[in-house]
């Protein structure tokens, strides 16, 4: 009976694995999925035949972000409407992985956790509920968490009910691979123990079977240890040789025979993640070396439950494996781990670990999180032309460091839960609360480091933009001062300067957009500062472009080109203004450090030199024509002094309305509130950081608020006075004074009279008496 039930459950799970949502996958044999293994080409499921296929372009390998995974799903399934991705619940075994540049390979098998590409509108999974099992679900609309978080929630809930997690699925998507709830099925411990080995049910509380050795290692004999070690060694040799064959041959790989001499395999094996030995070394030395290695998660991001032998404790403990890399101290089950490493004494292992193992420096683990100063290295290194690449690497190192620390905490959490099985519920909750606080602390620390990274990157980008703008302005003024000036060369230099200014504006808008996505309140606070900074950019461009019309001959010749440039960029200016005025849009969370906006076109927008600043001033203002500029009969531009500010003076050319413009003055200009149209202007240092405040534009708002406050206070006072007068108005009730010595009948009658009752007989006699 039990074997039949197990077969039925297996068949049902298989049908569900091939099951396709009815909304967009009708008629497909398999669900769209992708799988990644770092160092090999990505794999995707062929929805027509249900087989895994390599990346069609032959170039794409493992992807580090959820946004990238979603984009890759949309690339490999262009005919489907992929709207989201979610990590699969179970790992799968996939064959024929290829290196980059090859599209068809054989014999390469890896176990990975794929990502499901969700089609159309999200539909929750239909979970099978076996007999004696319970279907539960949890939703929290105030949180938006990953697949791993909800898996942990489901597992903890089942554990509190003394049951095992049988199956689960996500509910209520709120972002890319993020959800607001989980549905799950909890089954009694006895039901789960029928389908797995009894030792696993007692020692391993994991609800997922990750594959592995099915042989019974209960005896733990020396012969079986030798057999296991040799089998693993041969498998590693075969994989390494197959990798070498890919680099030499163009055809399909052929599986290597196990009889190949160890000497040849050892010469080609250079990775420290695997331990090879020659025929002269004993198997005991191999086992000691394998079991003495520290647990390695590897560079990949999967969270696969595995076991490794801990030298200090002398037993096998659980940890999370990333899915690639690592070393051979990595076992599917605790029983398998103890069968290999349990027969080796702790003293010999400690002796082995005290001696440094030979390592190839070229094959050290690729996870940079092991270095505590991974981010500090970026912060201490000055910025250069490769700032963006350095920032991306530092961001990746930071995320790798965070993942490694989270993996360590999850391993400790898993071990603590296993040890707290028989403790009271209060102690279990204390353990859970402790690790939840630890996880929150790590998340907060990572968020602070991300913020520091972004701020440093912003400051360096601002410095680079200022340098480029200053250099472009110097070249533009030099071209104007040339004798004779070349109009087209002047226009090219002007165009480069305008582009530099637009880079500044684009960077400002990117920063504002990022703040608006992650913190709308802060965006509302800095909005006026951003507008002020944009005004400074426009005024600076206005002053710079006015220099062109000091040379009428040059300005007249390139007037059409300048007009065309302005007309081309006018539409983009309208979009910028609309974005600044519009309400902040809702984003799916904080996955992106810096939103990647498309490269924008350059824009030339001029503002009036004087007058109050308003949103209308941001509209494109066509440059004044050549006829409106006083003629410069000498066809010269005012000489520009590049000396420091202390060594140069301000001289105004009569009738021009412009000062003797310098590079630093235009690049760092901040218009004073008192200057007139025909007078010189004061030059101040104005950085890209938003510290300026538009005081003038707030006067009207302050006056309006004061008047409104007076009106509201008046209304409140009048209302209070009226209410108080109403309280003192007299309330008349018909109360009849009753003697305390009267009879109960008379007292009852008096109460009736108080309530409005009038006896017709009494009324008749009263009228008679009157």
Curated annotation (Swiss-Prot):
Subunit structure: Binds, via its C-terminus, to the PID domain of several cytoplasmic proteins, including APBB family members, the APBA family, MAPK8IP1, SHC1, NUMB and DAB1. Binding to DAB1 inhibits its serine phosphorylation. Interacts (via NPXY motif) with DAB2 (via PID domain); the interaction is impaired by tyrosine phosphorylation of the NPXY motif. Also interacts with GPCR-like protein BPP, APPBP1, IB1, KNS2 (via its TPR domains), APPBP2 (via BaSS) and DDB1. In vitro, it binds MAPT via the MT-binding domains. Associates with microtubules in the presence of ATP and in a kinesin-dependent manner.
Residues at the site labelled Required for Cu(2+) reduction: 170
MF-aspect GO terms: heparin binding; identical protein binding; protein domain specific binding; protein kinase binding; RNA polymerase II cis-regulatory region sequence-specific DNA binding; serine-type endopeptidase inhibitor activity; signaling receptor activator activity; transition metal ion binding
Region (Interaction with G(o)-alpha): 732-751
Maturation and modification: Proteolytically processed under normal cellular conditions. Cleavage either by alpha-secretase, beta-secretase or theta-secretase leads to generation and extracellular release of soluble APP peptides, S-APP-alpha and S-APP-beta, and the retention of corresponding membrane-anchored C-terminal fragments, C80, C83 and C99. Subsequent processing of C80 and C83 by gamma-secretase yields P3 peptides. This is the major secretory pathway and is non-amyloidogenic.
Domain E2: 374-565
Gene3D superfamilies attached to this UniProt entry: 6.10.250.1670, Amyloid precursor protein, E2 domain, Amyloidogenic glycoprotein, copper-binding domain, Amyloidogenic glycoprotein, heparin-binding domain, Pancreatic trypsin inhibitor Kunitz domain, Pleckstrin-homology domain (PH domain)/Phosphotyrosine-binding domain (PTB)
Protein name (record): Amyloid-beta precursor protein
Modification type Phosphotyrosine: residues: 497, 757
Domain notes: The transmembrane helix undergoes a conformation change and unravels partially when bound to PSEN1, facilitating cleavage by PSEN1.
Consequence recorded when altering residue 759 to A: No MAPK8IP1 nor APBA1 nor Dab1 binding. No effect on APBB1 binding
Organism in which the protein naturally occurs: Mus musculus (Mouse)
Signal peptide boundaries: 1-17
Compositionally biased region (Acidic residues): 193-207, 228-264
Localization in the cell: Cell membrane; Membrane; Perikaryon; Cell projection, Growth cone
Similarity-based family: Belongs to the APP family.
Effect annotated for changing residue 757 to G/H/V: Greatly impairs interaction with DAB2
Impact reported for residue 762 to A: No MAPK8IP1 nor APBA1 nor Dab1 binding. No effect on APBB1 binding
Protein residues bound to Cu(2+) 2: 677, 685
Site (Cleavage) residue list: 197-198, 219-220, 671-672, 678-679, 687-688, 690-691, 711-714, 720-721, 739-740
Mutagenesis or variant effect for residue 760 to E/F/I/K/L/Q/R/V/W/Y: Greatly impairs interaction with DAB2
